[in-house]
Amino acid sequence: MWSKLSISSKINRIRDPESDNTIEDTHVARVMRKYYMDKIGTLPEWLRPPGWQPPVNTGPTSPVSINASNAAPSNLKASYIPANPRRLSSSTSSASSPPLRRLPSVQHSTFDDLFEGVGSLQKSPSTTKPLSSTPSGSLLRSKFDHTRKKF
């Protein structure tokens, strides 16, 4: 009994400094603070920790231009450049498919807007038919019904 108690008290004293030890300083709160500081330069009132002071504004900031001759790979951010789908596929069926439509980027002012934006993109009108109305769907439905009747 005493050995378990002493072990648990030692474990409680050894804590990761990055662990979630207070309500105001959880991992999620730290990540969200970093996000808002990077995006808008300040924190929303509901996310501010006790005693937080807003950063002093020294004037408008401008993006730093990097000269291509002295740019180091560590200074540049990686970006995703989609490949041309026609070069990826050698079949002729991809040429008849409509070109991919790129959705406009959405600027979110709050964390809730971020989720509302995702929901509105997913609720776009669909042109798909129910499974049973397509030829392959009706074939699947008939096979399913046929197998179900056997048992």
From Swiss-Prot:
Residues 55-77 have a biased composition (Polar residues). GO terms for cellular component: cell division site; cell tip; cytosol; nucleus. Residues 85-105, 123-141 have a biased composition (Low complexity). One of its GO terms (biological process) is vesicle docking involved in exocytosis. This is Uncharacterized protein C1F5.05c. It comes from the Eukaryota. Residues 48-151 are annotated as: Disordered. The lineage of its organism: Eukaryota, Fungi, Dikarya, Ascomycota, Taphrinomycotina. Transmembrane segments: none annotated.
